[in-house]
Amino acid sequence: MCIRDRENIMEEFVSNFIEEFRNLFINDKDIKSIIAIGDGIANLKKVGPELNITDKITRDQFRVLYHKVVETTPEVLSEKYGVPYERATLMLPMAIIYQSFLDNSRAEDIITPDVTFCDGIVADYMDKNGTLLLNKNFDEDIIASANSIAKKYKVNRKHTQNVTQNALDIFDSFKSVHGLGRRERLQLQIAAMLHSCGKFVNMNEGTMMSYHIIMSTEILGLSHKEREEIANIVKFNEYYLPSQTKAQVSLMTADYMKVAKLASILRLADVLDKSHRQKISDMKFSFKDYVLTMTVDTLNDITLEAGVFKTKTELFRKVFGVKPVLKQKRGL
């Protein structure tokens, strides 16, 4: 089999997977750069010394590298560019994979930082043990990842945005009582964003479908435990939350009290937009004698929301020992 035949077969095989990846995760996103690390990309850079590549490979530069690898045998690549033979045999499939990523993402270049996967493992270990402090805040990346999932499952954007904002406002209104921090607030935000994504799969079993979607979908920047907690927050937004002893088996590694607290907040935020017409926003809060009063200044008829609200406060009262009250102020 000639080199060109091998290239065509590999390209056809690889493109199938890359196209599936594009359809699932990229869609219409504007991808400007691909980041590549490891020996594979480092060896490919050796093939074009005349290109003076440092930490970025343009599309045109990569096309030159690609043709050189396609037209050269592993034996020659190894001898001419000082690449170990076993690594040289991998250069053609690596070149095809990167070229396919460029074609399918329409990225402008490939960024090649001088780091390896092992560097990442060491940095992660040092960060967790307090010997290295990473200042990068990944919240925006996590939210962007959740937004992609919400878009994929065609959630009602206006409804989820309203529920999300109300949930965060409730969370912020009595911090001194719930004792939860920034990370838990982020989990509540993601749960609110994805609480109805399962309706795209099954309208009648939307909540359980949402649970399964979150459990089976990686969210960049979240641990498996955090994602499991978010899935259960969404589940118990609608379903009855049993006692800790009975619930622990189904919760697996999730923290029961965290799930209970955040699910109780999400329940209130969700019913505040029961009609899906965004009648309630910009609430004013007052907390006194363990009563959390939510005052809404609106001329809208919130009879539906107010009625259902009263049926959704039990878990909140049990978990926090706080009575939530919804009041309407009909201002002009």
Feature map (PLM): residue ranges:
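Helical "lid/coupling" subdomains associated with nucleotide-phosphate turnover
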Residues: 4-267, 273, 288-290, 294, ...
